[in-house]
Amino acid sequence: MQVYLVGGAVRDYLLGHSYQEKDYVVVGATPEHMLAQGFQPVGKDFPVFLHPETKEEYALARTERKSGQGYHGFQFFTDTTVSLEDDLIRRDLTINAIAMDQDGKIYDPYGGQNDLENKILRHVSEAFAEDPLRVLRVARFAARYFPYGFQIAPETLQLMQTMADSGELDALTPERVWKETSRALMENHADIYFQTLRDCGALKHLFPEIDALFGVPQRPEYHPEVDCGIHTLMSLQQACKSNYSLDVRFAVLVHDLGKALTPAKELPRHIMHEERGIKPVTQLCERLRVPTQTKQLALSVCKEHLKCHQIMSLKPGTLWRLLQRLDVLRRPERVEAFVQACECDAKGRLGLEDRPYPQAQYMREAMQIVRSIKVQDLPENIKGAEIGEMLIQYRIEALAEFKNQHQSLSHS
């Protein structure tokens, strides 16, 4: 039997990038051979084994044939006659269809090295169209390799468009869409993922709420980029640039969904877009089964981001209630995530990317002030329900003093 390193590890090795995961394909072996050598079977749909010592994945070389719709609609065939070339041709992109043997010799039957050199993302064969998840995977690779100058081959983008138009994307499960999208959101250029999906016509099928933002105008004095969709992707790029968490990136992505629902007669103003956004954000999160914590921050940012922009003019009581809704006393990290998302929104505007956002520091200081006031600070004779009422009173008074000090400093 022959063992080859395949896929992403070989691709990244040839690019000179670091890699963690190693996947191997085994040619000329049977499940019985693998078990006899101590490998542990883990594959449900096809024979995949874990190495007894390294726990790395070893898959028997296989072919596959489309038998139904969607990601799971395949029949797999594996035996000792399946060659390395047979296994590699079923892979998505030529740059992922390269193998390396244990002596370091490269096997590249489909031109992957040439495409690496020319910075091209190209499908291996027409079988690419049999798996709709590959549309999302290619979009994610476009995001990952964007800084290195990679582009999708025109014929591959055309095939992705055909797949999007065919309705095959509807067969993808919410879990698969979210898994691929959450991985894409953590790329350094996550905006390219969504732009690529839009370019191939997949965005309107998978994320209609986001697709609807493109072409919707905003007031140019506040948004020089004008287009709501462009603003959304610019804001997302700010979150990526700052290396923020998945929760923050997703919240930034959906913060303005309400603008797509603004009545035409009100454009380019978007009064009450925060309230209008609650329904589409909720729908998107429920459809994709977005984790609860991620959904909660997204809804908070959607509902409250204008208050963060206007924070210095908020009345102390209004600011306290905002902090309360963000669960400032139990979850200060959520307030921080909220501030980060709002700052990305403010900086996701053409020509304003580097403008200071003093509201962020103001919010952080306000958070520290209310968190510093404890029960021990109250008079000893306060009992029962009065304790909670007086804590609120003390916190609002402290915020009022903070606001006055801030205004005095800014006017001095």
UniProtKB/Swiss-Prot annotation:
Q: Which UniProt keywords apply?
A: ATP-binding, Hydrolase, Magnesium, Metal-binding, Multifunctional enzyme, Nickel, Nucleotide-binding, Nucleotidyltransferase, RNA repair, RNA-binding, Transferase, tRNA processing
Task: Tell me which domain of life the UniProt entry assigns to the organism this sequence originates from.
Answer: Bacteria
Where's the HD domain? 228-329
Residue spans crossing the bilayer: none
A Pfam match is: PolyA_pol_RNAbd
- The EC number(s) given in the record are 2.7.7.72, 3.1.3.-, 3.1.4.-
Cofactors (names): Mg(2+); Ni(2+)
Summarize where CTP binds, as residue positions.
Answer: G8, R11, R91, R137, R140
Mind listing the GO molecular function terms for this protein?
ATP binding; CCA tRNA nucleotidyltransferase activity; cyclic-nucleotide phosphodiesterase activity; magnesium ion binding; phosphatase activity; tRNA binding
PROSITE patterns the UniProt entry points to: HD
**What are the recorded Gene Ontology BP terms?**
RNA repair; tRNA 3'-terminal CCA addition
**How cofactor binds (record note)?**
Magnesium is required for nucleotidyltransferase activity.
Give binding positions for ATP. G8, R11, R91, R137, R140
Catalysed reaction(s)? a tRNA precursor + 2 CTP + ATP = a tRNA with a 3' CCA end + 3 diphosphate; a tRNA with a 3' CCA end + 2 CTP + ATP = a tRNA with a 3' CCACCA end + 3 diphosphate
Annotated Mg(2+) binding lies at E21, D23
* InterPro entries given in the database record: CCA_bact, HD/PDEase_dom, HD_domain, NT_sf, PolA_pol_head_dom, PolyA_RNA-bd, tRNA_CCA-adding_enzyme
- Sorted alphabetically, which HAMAP family does this protein's record hold? CCA_bact_type1, CCA_bact_type2
Q: What's in the domain note? A: Comprises two domains: an N-terminal domain containing the nucleotidyltransferase activity and a C-terminal HD domain associated with both phosphodiesterase and phosphatase activities.
Q: What is stated as this protein's family in its record?
A: Belongs to the tRNA nucleotidyltransferase/poly(A) polymerase family. Bacterial CCA-adding enzyme type 1 subfamily.
Q: Report the protein's function.
A: Catalyzes the addition and repair of the essential 3'-terminal CCA sequence in tRNAs without using a nucleic acid template. Adds these three nucleotides in the order of C, C, and A to the tRNA nucleotide-73, using CTP and ATP as substrates and producing inorganic pyrophosphate. tRNA 3'-terminal CCA addition is required both for tRNA processing and repair. Also involved in tRNA surveillance by mediating tandem CCA addition to generate a CCACCA at the 3' terminus of unstable tRNAs. While stable tRNAs receive only 3'-terminal CCA, unstable tRNAs are marked with CCACCA and rapidly degraded.
Q: How is this protein organized at the quaternary level? A: Monomer. Can also form homodimers and oligomers.
Recorded hits in PANTHER family, A to Z, give:
MULTIFUNCTIONAL CCA PROTEIN
Query: Extra info from the record?
Result: A single active site specifically recognizes both ATP and CTP and is responsible for their addition.
Q: What is this protein called?
A: Multifunctional CCA protein
Organism of this sequence: Acinetobacter baumannii (strain SDF)
Q: What would be the name of the gene that encodes this protein?
A: cca
